[in-house]
Amino acid sequence: MKSINPDDFKVIGKIDLSKIPTNLFNGASEDAKEEKLDKVQTKLSELQDVMYAHNRYGVLICLQGMDTSGKDSLIREVFKEFNPRGVEVHSFKTPNSTELEHDYLWRHYLALPEKGKFAVFNRTHYENVLVTRVHPEYIMNENLPGIEKVEDITPQFWEDRLEQINNFEKHISQNGTIVLKFYFHLSKEEQRKRLLRRLEEVEHH
């Protein structure tokens, strides 16, 4: 089986997702993949113990991807060997009434990992420039100054949000949080298959 090279997953500069393969290990047997996963689980568990004892850094793992891309499955499989007291998973849904009384990054600040621990964001702060950009009417729920109607949301608004998110990540990185970001790249055909499979499973239950 092809060894995992972290450089294969790095994103530098602008990219075209249509030109990036969705499966770097196509053709590898399931046994080979399982063996590799076992080694990764063991290594991560060892690193968790070291990081907890060091108590200097926290690790934030950001998972972003389309529905059925495998975020939940990854969390179950990769982190099952972890000490559960050292990792917290946060799935960010539609903001509730309390969260809407604060700025959009507030709830993400609350979920940041303590030193020596891991936090996993299943869907992330990027939703605030992804989902809301497709559905700008959601911004109206935030009661922002100067935004009285959807038409008030200008291109500069989104540029400002991107800068705010960059500053957020820079701030937490400089204060001991290691930020690891993963995008789950899924082809349209594979997503269609998974959605159909999910529908079949629901019908059988």
Write out the residue ranges for each language-model feature.
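Glycine-rich phosphate-binding loop of ATP-dependent small-molecule kinases
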Residues: M1-H205
